[in-house]
Amino acid sequence: MQTDKEKSLLRRLPWLQTLLASLVCILLGLLVGYIALLIINPAGANEAFLSIIKNFWSYSKPEKQLKNLGVTLVITAPLVMCSLSVLFAYKVGLFNIGAAGQYVAGAGACLYCALALKLPWIVCLLAAILAGALLGVISGAMKAYRNVNEVISCIMLNWIMLYLVNTVLATVKNPTGKDTYTLASRNPGAILPTVGLNDLFGQKNMTIAVPLAVVMCVVIWVFLSKTRLGYELRATGLNRNAARYCGMRDRFNMILTMGIAGGLAGMGAAFMFLSDFEQWAVTQASVPAMGFNGIAAAFLGGLNPIGAIFSSYFIQHISRGGGHLNMNMYSPQISDLILAVIIYMCGFVLFMKKFMNTQRGTGRKSRKGGRDQ
């Protein structure tokens, strides 16, 4: 009984450890951003900082607030999917830095199906998922059969997919610019259904992508926590040799994991581009940041599918908030600085949790030693 009483709140509630560690990362990022604002222009630092935090609340009219909230939610949905891709693989002991390339593959597949083949949205969505999954399977197979580090193979595939997609989508580029055609102008049937969300938020790009992203978070949580296959995948990640000894198909599990992770990232690309919110620039020379930001969102959310919803929204909220700064005094890149610090600190989330457990463990040993004396 005495041992139970000595258990700390932090040790009994692991989610609280994750929450506290994530909050520390967020607060440090906000602090650095505020200091940068003070250095640039102390007089307007407080107002500028509040503008970043408030984001759409900076508008006085409710309809403007709702519309800009819709924009934030639209760009949150693909980030949620990319963070799910990263955390799903991480739960199985793999670091899916290839979420960026899988996102690119999904973007290329859905846009080509929509603009070149004039297919309906459901087919374009499935094409994006399959393209991302295929890229993930390639990395998983290289890891399973040739023991090629997934980080190396994923990074190489990221760049291969970028230039491949640029080449393919050049066939559906608008001649007046560097971007692909809008779906509304060429194939409105490829746009995801809005089911009234566009009217509710006053934002035409508000589609089923947002609720679907939330549903996928719940599905992944249930799959990893409550199903036999999810248990096998996690067991393979914890100890591949032990899993094989227990009769689990370790190679198949690794390939399946990367395939599912790739499919999630590909779905994220479909959520972005099939909402017709953004077009693909066929001349871009760098991989879109969405996939890499998914890494930050995954760790900031404590590698929990439900936490990924809130961390992804926070990242996009701060990113959009930078657009409300007074451009004569500050650069909107201040919000990027805040996010950069938060992303950097995300690497310490697991370290902070381990530190909390170590400290509590040391404290109990000291008290036990005192009683023995």
Describe these PLM feature segments:
Residues 1-26, 34, 39, 238, ...:
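Cytosolic-side transmembrane-helix boundaries in multi-pass membrane proteins
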Residues 55, 150, 154, 158-226, ...:
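Transmembrane helix-bundle core of multi-pass membrane transporters
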Residues 10-20, 90-97, 116-121, 125-187, ...:
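Short loop segments and helix-boundary regions at transmembrane helix junctions
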Residues 37-41, 56-116, 129, 133-148, ...:
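Single transmembrane alpha-helix segments in multi-pass membrane proteins
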Residues 259, 264-265, 269-340:
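Transmembrane alpha-helical segments in multi-pass inner-membrane proteins
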Residues 201-280, 305-306:
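Helix-loop-helix "hairpin" substructures at the membrane interface of multi-pass membrane proteins
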Residues 150-152, 178, 205-212, 254, ...:
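Loop-to-transmembrane alpha-helix initiation sites
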Residues 2-81:
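Membrane-interfacial amphipathic/re-entrant helices at transmembrane-helix boundaries
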